[in-house]
Amino acid sequence: MMFWSSKTGITSKYSFSSSPTFTAEPWSIYTGRPKSSSSSSPSKVSIFMFDKKQFENYLLHYGIIKSKSGSRDKVLIQEAYEILRNQANNLAKLKHPNILTLIEPLEEHSKNFMFVTEFVTSSLETVFRETDDEEQNFLQGHVKDNIVVQRGILQLVNALDFVHNRASFVHLNIQPRAIFINENSDWKISGLGYLVKIPPGTNTSEYFLPQYDPRVPPFMHLQLNYTAPEIVFENTLTFKNDYFSLGLLIYFLYTGKDLFRSENSTSEYKLEYNKFESKISTMSWDNIFSKVPQKLRHCIPKLINRDIYSRYDNITLILDSEFFQDPLVKTLNFLDDLPTKNNEEKYVFLEGLVNLLPEFPPALLQKKFLPILLELLSQFCAEKVVSDKCVGKSLDLIIKIGSTLSQLSFQEKVYPVLLSDANFPVLLKKATICLIDNLDTLKQKVKRSDFLENILKPLFNYVLHDSESDITVVCQEKLLSQIPLALEVLDFPTVKQFLLPLLSNLFTKTTSLTVKNTCVTCFQIMIEHKSIDSYTCSETVLPLFKSMKTRDPRILSKLLKLFETVPLIITDEIVLVDQVLPLMWNYSMASTLTKSQYSGYTKAINKMSSDIQKHHIAKLDDKVNDIGEDAFHKVIEPTIMKKEDPETVAAKNIEVAAMQPVKKKTGSSYGETLPQSKSILNSKPLNPKNALATRGFPTRILNSPPQTPSSRTGSKVMTKGGSNDASSTKVEEEFNEFQSFSSTGSIRQTSAPSDVWMNSTPSPTPTSASSTNLPPGFSISLQPNKRKDGSSDIPRSNVYGSLI
C-alpha cells in the first residue's frame, strides 16, 4: 500500500494511502497513520476527502452549471460545499460514543476538502448491501452476526436519543451511507449535513424539500428512499421523521435491499409509498418484514406508521422491547461503560463474562472485547493496591479470547501488553495461577523463543524458587503438573542446567509432602522422556533420595515407580547395584509400609536383581565363547613363519652416539701438547649386537697399535707453509678436533697440534680380540675437540681425531 503526504495541515501530520479504503457518497475515505509517535495519538485514523475539481467538472459535463465563474453557478456550487461543511462541523458540535468522532476539523483547499475522524473500516452500505461478491460477503460476515446487528441498532437508538432529547436536532439523513463501523464493530452515526434544530417549546416544524434535479449528485438532496412520508407529503418536520428512517434502515439490514425505490423523485416516492400501503392492507406486517427477527418485528409498525402519533412517543421506548433485553446485548452495553465502574463491579462483570464468551462471535470478541480488556488489565496493574482477583480474571479472559487469534495477531496485539515492563512483574505475583493454567495457550500463540525466555523460565524461577505468597504450595503443585509441557520446549542443556537444579532444590527444601511427592513424579517423567542422561540421573537425582528422611508411604510408593523406570536410562550394572538396589532395600524395610506396599518393593527388587544377573551371565557367556572360538582357531590355523632379512634386523639395532663438541681451553697454543685421550686399546669393544653384518664385503683387520701423540710428532711430515708464518690465513674455528665415541663408551683420539700434511700412512685403528670387525667405510664416530687458546690456525680438514 502506497502512502503519501504533503507539508501543510492534515497532510503534514498524517500519511495515508494513495487509494481510498472505501467510499461513502460524497466522501472518499482513506486509512491514515500519524507521523508522530505520541502515545496519546491513535495508531490509525480515517481521512475523509472530497475532490472539488472532480465535482465541478461533473457539474459542467452534465450541464448543471455553465461555468465556474457565473454568479448563479457559484451559488449552486457553494450550496453543495455548505452541505459538506455542515457534515464536518456538526461532528465537532455533537460528541457522543455513537456519533463519529472528529479528530481534525475540516480543511478547505483549492482542490479538496478533508477532515480526520476515528478509524472506521466500512459503512452499512458497503457491508449490508446485497451483492454477488462471495468473497466480500465472507470477509464481512462477522458484521452481519445477529448480536452485532442487535447491538448496532441499539447504538443507533442511543445516538438518536442524544440528538433528539439532548441536542434537539432532527437528523433527516439516517441511511446506510451515513452509518459507519469502526474496528471494534461499533456503529457510528454521521451524515450530519441536513441536521435541523426543532424550535424550543414545540415538537414539530416545517421543512420544504428543494426542487429535485436528477442530474445533481445524491448528496445535494435528501435520500428519499429513507425519508418519512410526512416530509414529502406535508412538509412536516418532527423527531419522528427519524423513527421512520430507522424502520426503513432495519428492513435494509435484514434484507440487503431498500424498501422504497424512488430514484430520488418525489413523484416516484409517492407511487412507491402507495404500493407499500396497499401491501400493508392486503398483507400483514409479518409477511412484509418476515426476515426481521420476531422480537423486533412487532416494533416496526411503531416506527414506520403513516400516522406520526401512532409511532413511539420517544425513541428510547423501543429499548423496552424484548429484542434489546438479550443478555449478550446488555453485556455489550455494560462493556462500553466498564471504565466508569468500581473494581468490585468490574470483577462481578468479568466473572460473569467467562460463561458468556462462547455465545459471542469470535470476531466481535477480538474486535470489541479484547482492546477494552487489555486496557483494563493495564489499569489494574498500575493501581497502587493491586486486586489479585481482578488482575487474574481479566488476564484469563484475555488469553481465552486470544486463543481465537492467529499466532501472528496474538504476538502483535496481546503479547506486548502482557510482557510489558509494567505489567508482567505484577502478573507473575498476582495472577500466577492464571498464567500456569493458560501455559498451553501461551505456548501455542507465542513464538517459541519468546515463550521460553520471557514466560516459561521466569514463571518456573518465581514459583519454584522466589515465591513466598500464601498460595505458593498450590502454585508449585499446579506448575509441576505442567512438566510434560515444559519438556516439549526445553532442550537437554536447559533441562540439566535450569530445570533440574530448581526441582532438586525444591525437593530438598520444601516442607510440603504433596510438593515433594510431585517432584518425584517430575523426576520420573524426565526419566521416561529421557530428558536427562544416565550420568545426570546417577549423580544428581539418585543422591537426593539418600539424604531423604521421610518414610511416608505415599512418597515411598512414588519412589518405587521412579526406581522401576531408572533402568530405562541407567544400564550400567555397577550403578544399579551400588546406588539403586541399596535405596530400594532401605525403603522397603520402612515400618510405615503396608504389606502390599512392601510386596511391591520386593517384586521390584527381585525383578531388577534378576535382570542384572541375567545380563551379567550373558556377558560372561559371550566372553567364554569368544575365548573358545579364539583357541579353536589357533589350533586349526597353521603357523606361518615370517622371513626376516638379517641385514635389516642388524641395521635396526645399530646405535651411534651423536658427535659432541669440546670447547677449546684459554691460553693454549698449537705448540703445547693437548692432553691425551684414553687409548683406544683401553676402551670397551663394540657391542657385537650392534655390529652390522658384512656379508659380501672384505673384513678389515686392524692389528697396529694406536699411534700416540708423541710418536706422531716424531714422524716425518711435510709442512704446508710454516707453522709460525704470520701471513698465513687464520681460520677462527670454535672446534678443530673431534672426539670419537662408540655405543659402549667414549673414545677420544687427539691429534698433534701442528699444521702439517702427513706423508706417512695413517696408523690403523686399534682393536681387541673381542671387538667386532666393521665393514669398509665404517669407523668410530668422530667428535670435535676444542683447540686451546693461542694455538695456530689450522684448517679443520688437516687434523682428525681418529683415522679410518
Curated annotation (Swiss-Prot):
It comes from the Eukaryota. Residues 666-804 are annotated as: Disordered. GO terms for cellular component: cytosol; mitochondrial matrix. CDD domains: PK_SCY1_like. InterPro entries: ARM-like, ARM-type_fold, CIK-Related_Protein, Kinase-like_dom_sf, Prot_kinase_dom. The protein kinase domain is predicted to be catalytically inactive. Residues 760-776 have a biased composition (Low complexity). The gene is SCY1. GO terms for molecular function: ATP binding; protein kinase activity. Present with 1480 molecules/cell in log phase SD medium. Residues 667-685, 701-729, 744-759 have a biased composition (Polar residues). PROSITE patterns: PROTEIN_KINASE_DOM. This is Protein kinase-like protein SCY1.
